[in-house]
Structures are given as C-alpha cells and as structure tokens.
Amino acid sequence: GSGQILLRTVFLSLDPYMRGRMSDAASYSAPVGIDQTIEGGPISRVVDSQHKGYQPGDWVLSGNGWQDYAVSDGSGLINLGAQAEHPSYSLGVLGMPGFTGYMGLLDIGAPKAGETLVVAAATGAVGSVVGQVAKLKGCRVVGIAGGAEKCRYAVQHYGFDVCLDHRAADLAQQLAA
C-alpha cells in the first residue's frame, strides 16, 4: 500500500537477551508467547516499496522480529543502502552487542592501560568486543569460555592474552595462575 515497504529477512541475530524472553521465568521483559513472533532486529532486503525513502534492493535493519517477510511504514527502520558491503555486521560488532560491549567497557569499566581485565563469555558477541577494546586500551585481558576450542579462538582470533576454560577440572588452579 501507499507508504509501505515489503521486506524479506536475510539475516537474523540471536542476541544474549533473547534467552530470557524464551522462558516464563521472572525477567526484565515478558516472555514471547507460543503464537508470537520472536522479537529481534533482522537485516532485511527491500522487495517492493511505495515509500520515497526506500528502494527495492536496499538493505535495512528493522525491529520486525523473526519472520520471513514483513510490511513496514518505515518507522524504526535504518536504511543501510543498496551497496552495504557486510550488512550482517549491523547485527553484531556494529550493532547492539558490539555497542553494548564498547560502551559498557568504556563508560562503566573505564579501563586503564596496564590493568588486568577478566571477560566472561569471551567468545560471545559482547565479550569478544570487550576483550578487543580492552587490548586496544593497553589492558592484559583474561577470557573465560566454555571449552578448549573456544579458549584457543579467544587467544588466536580476538587477541586475548590468556583464556580459562570454565569446564576444566583445574579452573581454580588456572585462576590462581
């Protein structure tokens, strides 16, 4: 219809907060009902548009949830343009998880060069950003992850100084070192 945009979902994000939404346990937000669309910010492609600000082929970040197609009036959409090189980055390092890690560390943690920072969930969307930004700030970064493979990844790909496997039998000894 007039002023509307037809969107096709291409990328979905599984963000840490969603786990709480998929349980009826007490949480800061209500759980998703069986018959409801899971909330989330997918990256979609404009299929058809009757809206002057959007053209077919544009990539958009929306709040339309986990569904194949959605119709929008443009409210709340972020147009990434038709030539976005890596649109999925807007769901991770350039999106909510990356922003959370970056701002949380710098505004709340306020790390100083030479300090040691311990990062839980070191290979997760938020933890991986926290560790990398802390390294840029001159910190010694100790990650915690579940499994030797994740720990290797944190050190080799994200630049953590060391990573402790919380599943290892000798975790207390690792922490003491």
Model feature map: region roles:
Residues 1-14, 22-66:
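Glycine-rich beta-strand-centered segment in the early N-terminal region that forms part
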Residues 18-22, 125:
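Short, glycine/acidic-enriched capping/hinge loops at junctions between secondary-structure elements
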Residues 75-90, 114-116:
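Glycine/charged-rich beta-loop-alpha catalytic/anionic-binding loops adjacent to active sites
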Residues 91-174:
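Mid-domain Rossmann-like dinucleotide-binding core that forms the NAD(H)/NADP(H) cofactor-binding site
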